[in-house]
Amino acid sequence: MRYKNLIGFVWVAVIMSLFTSCLKDINNVYNPGTTAAVVRQHGDSALMMANTRFGWIYSTKLSSYSEGKCLLVSFDYDPSLPENTNAEQKGYYTVTIQGETAVNQQNAESPLTDTHKLLTNEQPILAVNPNDSVLYVKLEDYLFLPSACWTTKDRALNWQLTYDPTQQPVVENRKSIYSLYLRAAARTGKPEDKAEEAIAVINAFNLGNFIKDMREQGGRDADMYVRIHYIDQINPKDSTQFTWGVTAVSYTHLRAHETCA
């Protein structure tokens, strides 16, 4: 598709506008870049913390978020702080959050939407997980899913991730691969006075029901991998003509959520 050369630029621009996103080490203070996070009350404590791919982090800023809230955060970690003495033994790191933004959350749902026709005001998705983003990660039951969509700026979109609950996996290289279908539909028609452009979005989809359904079909957590299908081209003159794209196999391990220690 002729727009795909825009994806890398758009994605980098969006992430940079949220936070500083380069890995850096300044005076022994570490910033791992923009990171996906799920807010939880940690263990038996009353402290609200965030589960990240780096482990559990704590900041007083997290107290303003509810249990299970999905965020993108940028934080500094200073191992020399007294609060971080024996951090590994305590099970969490005290950090300074430099910026955070909430992520749209919803459930992966069944049944599968009709793949032979478009949704009302469906928008083409240019890419899923563009540039192999580090923000594509499964935390607990949430799959953080970066996507790039071709639409008009500031146009509200409804995203959905659906699946066939009775599907049987395709087995490749001893991996059991299941299919999820990502779609985006605008809530309103196309504004006449606005040009279309590539828009980068991150959604967090709860895969709890998907994992449960696949396990009931005989799937095992250790073998559950996914491909994500998405409509990548729509003929603007004939909406019956559209094509499906598909991601490479995701080796994000789809284990069922384990509660925090």
Question: What are the functions of these language-model segments?
Answer:
Residues 129-194:
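Short helix-loop boundary/capping segments
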Residues 18-21:
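C-terminal motif of bacterial Sec signal peptides marking the signal peptidase cleavage site
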Residues 187-222:
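Short, solvent-exposed, Trp/other aromatic-anchored flexible loops in extracytoplasmic proteins
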Residues 252-261:
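Conserved small/polar residues in nucleotide/adenosyl-binding loops
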Residues 2-9:
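Bacterial N-terminal signal peptides that target proteins for export
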Residues 92-148:
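Surface-exposed beta-loop interaction hotspot
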Residues 79-84, 231-239:
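Short acidic/polar inter-strand loop motif in beta-rich domains
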Residues 24-89:
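Start-of-domain marker
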